[in-house]
Swiss-Prot record:
The gene is CLP1. It holds the Pfam family Clp1. This is mRNA cleavage and polyadenylation factor CLP1. ATP binds at E31, K70, S154, A155, G156, K157, T158, A159. Component of a pre-mRNA cleavage factor complex. Interacts directly with PCF11. Belongs to the Clp1 family. Clp1 subfamily.
């Protein structure tokens, strides 16, 4: 018997449905690419040599349990590595699904890892130069590389961000990993924007491959402490103004951390983004400005690189900005909406319930609906109905709006709306962010500047009794009464 959060048997009795182990040798500089459905658990271990997944080295002779992933195991050394794996049915998944339980896998010698490693070495050289300069000039320190990764959807941007972060950590650096894609929950839940100093290896066995945080309890790996800004939607276009504002505020926090922490300052920043193209140049310009980006990496998009070089030619000519294009990995696969949604659900489930190694006991309780103040993000199409008629695929920029239709910058109307009469239709089965605002806060503008303390899930609202049943990751009263209702649905 194990106590949640205090270790225990991480290798329970094997499932009788587990397949016989398969062993093979992966040649050096090659990748073993595999896809594991959610209904299957892949038990993988490297028995000889060195193997890594997105820069995270697998421990020798220690099984790693993976489910619902599309990963690639890379052998960085010429001698390659020996891999052993087996599969079994994932009993945690709902039975009766028609989804396949078979894994898909193949080996490829055509990999862009050499280019990725060269990029890492260039960034490492930048960090060393920065550290040397700051040692000699402590009164006027410089910052390490602030890297912005851009590209189309399914270009491998997130994989590259993880590789660069992992390699930097191996060199004893602690870069800030910034996630600006609200679709992904990076050390947080979907619908958030986060910035996290990388102080340990990523936990590949977690639902999203990053690991746990102190907001959800103890963890096997060193828990990360992200700064979390609530966006509340899954796509930046749902409210572009709110997205840009939150990105800007996150940039302020990150740059402040760089000023105060010499180690993080020398290590720099790595920024992962949603799919952006030249139509989103206003968003890109804001990110470059907010995070003082000095390195832009474009993944497999020559046209975007050319357009950006024209747009930022003054910065490039003044050596304030460097741009580089790198190829897309042949192992990148298109993620369908159902797979993305299931990844999000697993991330939410793990936030409250933990994983196989570290199960958690979330707290279920009833609270009075009237004890809290509720705010919800405004959809751009609701604030400006003309946006509903945009052609599919077109980007929205506020520069095209008439001046008389722009709202005052201090207005909250285009960002949040207060839920004056919260009921089941507005709260039930939704994820709600707990803000860090004090109980008696009366300034609506502070909603934009606050960070997220944690999340709760509303499973049921009893309107007759004025009660709601909530799921919380901790056994305690909800510490704040100002809540942000997201559009992220979840059913236990």
């Amino acid at each position: 018997m194990s106590i949640p959060g205090f270790g225990g048997d991480e290798n329970p009795v094997e499932d009788l449905s587990e397949t016989n182990a398969t062993t093979f040798h992966l040649e050096g500089k090659s990748e073993w690419r595999f896809e594991v459905p959610f209904k299957t658990i892949l038990s993988l271990k490297v028995t000889e040599g060195v193997g890594e997944i997105f820069g995270t080295e697998l421990p020798l002779n220690v099984p790693v349990q993976l489910t619902g992933v599309k990963y690639a195991l890379y052998a960085p050394l010429p001698e390659g590595c020996t891999v052993e794996y087996s599969t079994r049915i994932n009993r945690d998944q709902a039975p009766g699904s028609s989804d396949s339980t078979d894994i898909s896998e193949y080996i490829s010698e055509d990999t862009p890892m050499n280019q990725y490693i060269n990029l890492h070495m260039a960034l490492e050289s930048y960090r060393q130069e920065t550290a040397d300069y700051n040692y000699l000039n402590p009164s006027s320190p410089r910052s390490g590389p602030r890297v912005l990764i851009l590209g189309n959807r399914s270009a491998g941007k997130t994989a590259l961000a993880r590789i660069l972060s992992s390699y930097a950590y191996k060199m004893d650096h602690h870069p800030v990993l910034v996630n600006l894609n609200p679709r992904d929950g990076v050390f947080s839940l979907p619908g958030s924007l986060t910035a996290t100093p990388i102080s340990d290896t990523f936990d590949l066995e977690s639902a999203n491959g990053y690991g746990g945080t102190t907001t959800s309890g103890s963890a096997v790996h060193n828990p990360k402490q992200p700064v979390v800004k609530n966006f509340g939607f899954l796509s930046p276009t749902d409210n572009l103004e709110l997205y840009k504002y939150q990105v800007s505020k996150l940039g302020v926090v990150v740059m402040s951390r760089l000023e105060e922490d010499a180690d993080v300052r020398n290590s720099g920043v790595i920024i992962d983004t949603p799919a952006l193209n030249i139509k989103d140049i206003n968003v890109i310009e804001n990110i470059v400005s907010d995070f003082e980006v000095n390195v832009v990496v474009v993944v497999d998009n020559e046209r975007l690189l050319i357009d950006l070089r024209k747009k930022f030619k003054h910065k490039i000519s003044n050596s304030q900005l460097a741009m580089v294009k790198i190829p897309k990995s042949g192992g990148v696969v298109e993620l369908d909406d159902s797979f993305i949604r299931q990844c999000q659900e697993e991330t939410i489930k793990e936030y409250f319930n933990g994983d196989r190694k570290t199960p958690l006991s979330p707290f279920k309780t009833e609270v009075d609906v009237k004890d809290f103040r509720y705010f919800k993000g405004v959809l751009s199409s609701d604030f400006n109905p003309s946006l509903s008629f945009l052609p599919s695929g077109d980007s929205y920029t506020t520069d095209d709006m008439d001046e008389d239709r722009k709202k005052d910058e201090n207005s909250m109307d285009k960002f949040y709306t207060a839920l004056e009469d919260p009921d089941a239709s507005k709260l039930e089965n939704l994820i709600i962010a707990i803000t860090q605002l004090p109980q008696n806060n009366k300034q609506p503008k502070d909603l934009l500047n606050t960070c997220v303390l944690g999340y709760i899930h509303v499973s049921r609202v009893d309107e007759a009794r004025g009660k709601m049943k909530v799921l919380s990751p901790m056994v305690a009263a909800i510490p704040r009464n100002i809540l942000l209702v997201t559009t992220i649905g979840y059913t236990e």
